[in-house]
């Protein structure tokens, strides 16, 4: 998701502009990840650095413009993350045009800043993260979304979109990427800008129980020449997922949160890795998280211990499967705007990585990480 916070400057009764910023930085120590191969790595990283700009030109016309760092030290490490013209009419139909989040699972629509844990998405990435140029970064693409609520009580929501998808490669016909998401709020309705989501409201959103279904499809999105120089037939990408979020405030003031997701990717007969640019995942993926926000403050914040498990079951063979156990604690100072996270991880996600499902190698390793997040 994207923030709509910071300083707001009112021009008149209908026109305004706001500016904000967000930073996420971390330290990680991973077993056997040092260049020597048998020592722990020790790495500081700037994971995200964003500038937010939002505004309204007319009561029905808004815009959103956000920048991001690509986590490098090059001179051109900032790029346009979002550039959206928003035409918002009523609860039923609203239209966003430009570079924006493609409809997908909750983890992707949360983005890093509105997830319940510091490392926000451990399951394989959808097709919208495989695009060309900067439009393929962080789940964005250039296109159009239509979103709204299908019921008067706003419990049933939807978003559907059409995007560039993968440009070039095997897609000689320049096919578009089609995406959609529908969700139902069984209890209180989640309140987020547009079709964005969050993975926790720290007890301030009421009693939450929401189930969402998302899907993406692009014809001839995969294929090309594999790593051995063999021409592979093109194949269609089909991905879909089901996610659940539950949250409630208990009698003692504590907040219990659970989140889960199932994801399925089909590469249309093209083997994972048999592509000139992609080593995409094909198979089933599962993840689940349970969090408990303790009542009362410790210093300036609250403690939130959690556990999480992720399993990515690659159908090409068990050697490309990977899983991870994670236990950690968040120190919540100001919700998603200021928090510190300490986590321990064990599995082969840190050694095999999250992108290559073709010929990745790695053992189960231990990892300790510390993350800092702040935004305004």
Which residues are covered by each model-predicted region?
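Detector for outer-membrane/organellar transmembrane beta-barrel domains
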Residues: 12, 183-315, 323-325
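Outer membrane beta-barrel
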Residues: 6-192, 264, 281-296, 302-325, ...
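Predominantly the C-terminal beta-signal and adjacent terminal strand-loop region
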Residues: 336-370
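A generic beta-sheet turn/junction motif
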Residues: 153, 251, 298, 333-335, ...
């Amino acid at each position: 998701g994207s923030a709509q916070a910071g300083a707001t400057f009112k021009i008149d009764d209908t026109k305004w502009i706001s500016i904000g910023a967000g930073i996420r930085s971390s330290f990680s120590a991973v077993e056997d990840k040092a260049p020597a191969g048998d020592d722990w790595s020790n790495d500081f990283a700037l994971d995200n650095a964003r500038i937010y700009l939002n505004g309204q030109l007319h009561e029905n016309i808004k815009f959103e413009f956000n920048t991001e760092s690509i986590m490098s030290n090059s001179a051109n490490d900032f790029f346009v993350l979002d550039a959206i013209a928003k035409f918002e009419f009523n609860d039923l139909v609203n239209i966003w045009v430009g570079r924006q989040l493609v409809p997908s699972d909750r983890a992707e629509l949360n983005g890093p800043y509105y997830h319940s844990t510091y490392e926000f998405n451990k399951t394989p990435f959808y097709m919208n993260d495989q695009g060309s140029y900067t439009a393929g970064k962080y789940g964005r693409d250039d296109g159009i979304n239509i979103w709204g609520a299908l019921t008067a009580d706003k419990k049933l929501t939807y978003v559907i979109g059409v995007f560039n998808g993968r440009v070039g490669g095997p897609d000689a016909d320049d096919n578009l990427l089609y995406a959609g998401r529908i969700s139902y709020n069984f209890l209180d309705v989640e309140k987020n800008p547009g079709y964005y989501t969050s993975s926790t409201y720290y007890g301030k959103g009421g009693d939450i129980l929401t189930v969402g279904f998302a899907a993406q499809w692009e014809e001839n999105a995969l294929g090309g020449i594999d790593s051995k120089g063999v021409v592979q037939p093109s194949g269609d990408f089909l991905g879909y997922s089901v996610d659940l979020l539950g949250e409630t405030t208990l009698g003692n003031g504590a907040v219990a949160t659970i989140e889960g997701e199932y994801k399925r990717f089909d590469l249309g007969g093209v083997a994972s890795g048999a592509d000139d640019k992609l080593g995409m995942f094909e198979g089933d993926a599962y993840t689940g998280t349970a969090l408990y926000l303790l009542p009362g403050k410790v210093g300036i914040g609250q403690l939130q211990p959690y556990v999480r498990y992720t399993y990515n079951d690659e159908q090409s063979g068990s050697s490309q499967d990977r899983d991870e156990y994670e236990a950690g604690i968040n120190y919540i100072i100001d919700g998603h705007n200021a928090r510190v996270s300490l986590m321990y991880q064990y599995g082969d996600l840190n050694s095999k990585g999250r992108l290559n499902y073709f010929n990745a190698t790695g053992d189960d390793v231990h990892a300790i990480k510390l993350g800092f997040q702040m935004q305004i």
